[in-house]
Amino acid sequence: MIMTLSTNTNSKVLKIMAVIGGLLLSATAARAQDVPVVNDEVLGFTGRFSASVDWKAYKGLHISAEYQLRTHHLFTAVERHQASLGLSYKVCDYFRTGIDYTFIGHYKSSDRSFRPRHRASIFVMGIYDLGMWRMSLKETLDFTHKAYDLNPYQDTRNSLNLRSRFKLSYRGYAPLEPYAYVELKNSFNDPAFDAIFDEDNQIWTDYEFLGYKTAMLNRIRTCLGAEWHITRNHSIDFALLYHWNHSLEIDTNKEGTKLKALYYENSNDLALSIGYKFSF
């Protein structure tokens, strides 16, 4: 039982947040014991810089737009250009929902090829205030279409992911609002297959593609930041993010009849994020 049913508003808020938070550990797949794990020992350091506009079109209804630039390790090259348009609605003081569209112009690090993506997102968020402290749980479902050539046996053309975030902020240092959060990202439809590893010859045999039904936790993000409310209309956000990334790397031929290599890859990176927002 998550919580005793109560007519008290705070109890209802906590119950909603607890139900949403139950998704935090969902969709994590069991790892096959015979799949090797490769750990990238290099700690990446990247940058994200953004500018956004938030328009309060009607009571509780907000329309937003944002441009973001991300860099590769040590700011050596552009990793992506990203533009988004969103619509959110404040249902009540403790519940919000919204939808977003994002265009992602991504550049592959190895050969700098352009890899455009289109992403549609829907989110729900529960909010609970305790004095100057604010807690929130946000669940975001992302549908991403990859509009470039890919091997369908190695990668998913239309991926479905769930991002689950718990955030804590303190509003007692106005105009500065420090915050911290942790976010889990689960993928729902990565490639699935059957295969047997021949240890004598060090090759994979009896490979069979089974569709897109592998689910697993593929990223943990933690963040420390602060939002500086310069005026009622202008604010700047500073943050340092840490990512633990976990992916299943698959190498097959284009016909999907032979599995050449298979391993899990773990990597870590830090990201410096600076964002400006104009609200009106």
Residue spans of the language-model regions?
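Sec/Tat signal peptide C-region and signal peptidase I cleavage site
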Residues: T28-A32
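Transmembrane beta-strand segments that form the barrel wall of outer-membrane beta-barrel proteins
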Residues: Q33-N39, G60-F75, R80, R96-S109, ...
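Outer-membrane beta-barrel domain signature
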Residues: P36-E41, H72-T76, S109-F114, N151-R157, ...
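Residues that define the transmembrane beta-barrel architecture of outer-membrane proteins
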Residues: L43-F49, E79-A83, P116-A120, Q154-L162, ...
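Residues on the lipid-exposed face of transmembrane beta-strands in outer-membrane beta-barrel proteins
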Residues: F49-W55, L85-Y89, I99, I122-Y128, ...
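Repeated loop/turn-to-beta-strand initiation elements of outer-membrane beta-barrel proteins
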Residues: K59-A65, D93-I99, G131-M135, A174-P178, ...
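Hydrophobic/aromatic-rich structural module bridging two neighboring secondary-structure elements via a short loop
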Residues: A77-W133
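Outer-membrane beta-barrel transmembrane domain signature
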Residues: T140-T257, K277-F280
